[in-house]
Amino acid sequence: MEKTLRSCADQIVEASIRAVLPDEAVRRALKDFHPEGRTVLVAAGKAAWQMAHAAVAVLGHVDGGVVVTKYNHVKGKIPGVTCCEAGHPVPDANSFAATQKALELVQGLQPEDTVLFLLSGGGSALFEKPLIPAADLEELTHNLLVCGADIVEINTLRKRFSGVKGGRFAQLCAPAHVVSIVLSDILGDPLDMIASGPAYPDSSTCAQAKEIVQKYHLPMTEQMLALLEQETPKALDNVTTRITGSVRELCRAAASACRNLGYEPVLLTDQLCCEAREAGSFLGSIARTQAGQGKKLAYIAGGETIVHLTGKGLGGRNQELALAAAPAIAGLNAAVFSVGSDGTDGPTDAAGGYVDGDTLAALEAGGWSGYAALQNNDSYHALKAVDGLIITGATGTNVNDVAVALIGAVAVIITYFIDSSLFLGLLSKILGALSVMTVLDNFAFYFVFD
């Protein structure tokens, strides 16, 4: 197989993530930001620290601030800002404590004051004031993750049991104005669903929440059932919202990186939303169908897949997507890889996974069954065994995932066996050799005489 496929994949991943880092996006969003009174900063999500760091650098100072992000995502001190780390994807006591600090910060503000609210993916777990016991919230979050609910369904329910989600945080900031700068991690950029919309009017309804409970047969306490009857804010007049990054930019950056490496990019979708295994099989089948054309091609899909947990292994949706593509591209000069822009894929240290035409054989040689690994949701260990993990570390951003199928240029070999008694003498005189190769475009013709 072409040894540069992995190198190309790594370069594409790096360029894609670099294009959606929050620093420049926040600077652009604050270009015309001129607050009149006090400015306090609240940042929540996996990219919260980097967003806050960039904002303070632009503004020069803030009149107080709170950052709440995932464990090991704080990179240092920010002047005037308290930085907190907390649980994700399940909120914990540190999530609740950090959120309480933010609520105390915004109390007593005046109409001329501004709350600069920096929001990124992961905020639903990290920024939380539960209206139900923490144990019940933890159980609900676990049940939603296990049953395969998508992010919109998860956040629709989370809003019902939270004192800050679904626009309630913006209500608590009043009469101050809230300027919300958002890195979108949800397909289509629905502002009321990103981190469960703490500062945006909620479009979901109690009826929809009840349907989700019934769909997945989720256990509810009497308190939770009562909260399902309480509607969230449907209008907020003290909020301005700006989206600064999304999966569309991630895909565009991936396409540009592919083009720079000599691949012809094709954007399949930036709305990918299906089972991770299905997406991997689909990308692998595209690679098999298109291979052999003599062209370097790249098929790109952005979005966020889901995984139904059926086993007890270790992995994530991007690793599972990649592993599922391995059978389709076995033996081909092709690769499929998928990464999360935040550098985290499931409860692992990997951002995603990579497979190529050699992966399936390498797995089997090492005693692994790709099918069994998928059934046990153990893509992490399977890919680790064949150097198929993509590890970036925490990136400081979060705008969904990008998956790419790379197809290298392949020479098609046609061999002709010619009776030497008829043609050997003539061809020897004309071509001056007993075995010659003529290359035309990407096709190689071998003439073998016997």
Kindly label every feature range from the protein language model.
Residues 323-410:
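Internal helix-turn-beta structural module
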Residues 1-42, 50-51:
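An N-terminal, well-structured beta->alpha segment
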Residues 176-179, 201-282, 286:
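Accessory alpha-helical/coil subdomains and C-terminal extensions
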Residues 67, 71, 75, 79-82, ...:
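Glycine/threonine-rich beta-strand-loop-alpha-helix active-site module
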Residues 54-64, 80-82, 103, 107, ...:
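A glycine- and small-aliphatic-rich helix-loop capping segment at beta-alpha/alpha-beta transitions
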Residues 69-112, 152-153, 157-158:
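Glycine-rich oxoanion-binding loops at beta->alpha junctions
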Residues 130-151, 202-217, 311-337:
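Gly/Ser/Thr-rich active-site loops/lids in small-molecule metabolic enzymes
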Residues 151-213, 217:
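A glycine/threonine-rich phosphate-anchoring loop and its flanking beta-alpha core
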